[in-house]
Amino acid sequence: GYTDGDIYGVEVDFENKKFTRLAGAVNRSAGSGFDGINAFGGRKRCNLTNDGRVAAYYGEAGFSTTGKLTQAVDRNPVGTESPDENLKFSAGTIVQVMVEQPKFYYKVVPLKTEKRTKGAITRKIRYYVSDTPKAGFKLHPAFIVNGQEHDVAYLAAFEGSLWDAS
């Protein structure tokens, strides 16, 4: 196992329905005990435009859950001499409510599997995450788009569905 304080893990024993925290996750309380870890506590709800720009974060003036901005938003620092027009958003701009997920690295260690005709079933496994690169860890694929590495990924904040009344 790992002893690094910045590697967080869990061992899942599916047969016995047992979950055991590992490495830096040991002795942490559920929820707030993980807030200081960027992969978990660094998540932020935001409004993302159709072209992938963050217009506002939850708690900021202008944040909206209506599907469009209800007021103009200027993300330029106050007093900026030459404001970046890409950081200005007009009221009515179409946005989605997303969760900004900071990048993280992961490692999966299967401990017990059962062979089946078509593949295998995992019975016991260890999952590890780290905010920083570690030997044997991989950057989660959500942070690689068209071969380019990104510092954040945007995930849906709400479940979605399609409905047709016809």
Describe each region flagged by the PLM:
Residues 1-166:
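Short, compositionally biased
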